Amino acid sequence: TIPRWLAMTLLFIGFVGIWQLATSMVWVSPIILPSPGETLNDLIFVGENLVTGGYMLTAFWTTTQTVFWGFLIALGIGFSLGVLVGETKFGERAVLPYLVAIDTMPKIAFAPLFIAWLGFGISSKVALAAFIATFPIVVSTAAGLYAASENERMLFKAMGATRMQTLLRLKLPTGLPFMFTGLKIAAVGVMAGVITGEFLGGGKGFGALIRQSASQMDTPRVFALILYLSLLGLLLYFTVLWAQRRIVFWQKEEQAGPVG
């Protein structure tokens, strides 16, 4: 089999080659798709601005803070609701139907409401990001609590374990792989929520810079900003993956990635 690094390198070279060919032959308008060289120049410009502490560093730090708080709030709410749904009849019968109903809605459409409720500051972006990222955590946590086999549950019951002991020593350890799958999905969702909020609600984040560059038809700058945002998303995703491999140490490495 081809090593992963070689396959990824060949795919990247092929992608950039087709991209360069399409722009040099003017198959696509430069306004729509800039050349790799133009994009690289803007990548360098944005990178220098980030390193020297310019206005883009302030914007990137604002977006990073929003992502962090949105993910942290989603983790707290999602885990709590997941335990409620997975451990209680009330949660399963009364709360879960409402959660499913809300989850079926296009959550990005709630962005104007959060802006109207919380204003144009960072709070509305954090709330939208947490709102989008909460549901995968709820579902994965509840599913993880059901993962323990009936024999294991009966064994704990026969040994006189309390409900809390069964939860902490059996259900949570067994369900951790499921929960981390939800966290990795949430890591992607929280990025979408933050950028959508910055698109619509303005502010000083990278999303606002992308909107400004797009309005000026500065496509290379838009591509460069998006690529740096993808690095932030990858950092969050691989942080969760790293935590999974440290905490769920009994799980095989190939089972821990890319999403489960």
State each model region's role.
Residues 25-72:
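Periplasmic/extracellular loop-to-transmembrane helix junction in inner-membrane transport proteins
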Residues 3, 57-69, 92, 99-102, ...:
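Alpha-helical membrane-interface segments at transmembrane helix boundaries
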Residues 100-136, 143-144:
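Generic hydrophobic transmembrane alpha-helix motif, especially the helices
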